[in-house]
Amino acid sequence: MKEIVESYFKQRSLVNHQLASYNDCIPLGDGSLSRMEKIVRSIRIGEDEPIEDDEGGMIKLDVLDKEIIVRMKNIRLGKPTVREANGAEHPATPMETRIRKLTYFSPVYMDFKIVRDDKPLPDEEESVHIGNLPIMVRSARCNLHQ
């Protein structure tokens, strides 16, 4: 019986289900839609009628009798890096961040486009750093992932 249990845990990690859930949520950069991207694309604020399109999430604002629509999509994660005091950056490892009491995180970027009814063409789509996401060790975005 002991051999069976040892064999099972050699093939599967104790935290395999947690890694799978985390990897399902985060954008992997392989072109597939992550759960995070699906949530962003499903956002509809200020719109009464459900709209199905590929333009991404939408926030509709009425400001001073002008309609402004903010479209958002393509959420992305960068690789975990450490920024030193002098501005230099290098790839982070979980051990380095733990020893230096830093957070092991990746920057999160998303594309935004603003459409105004008083302008004939929408503004250019712009990638914006919206925050940082802690990275789970050995996840698909971890620098130790093979």
Tell where the protein language model's regions lie, with residue ranges.
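Conserved N-terminal architectural modules of multi-subunit, DNA-dependent RNA polymerase core subunits
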Residues: M1-H145
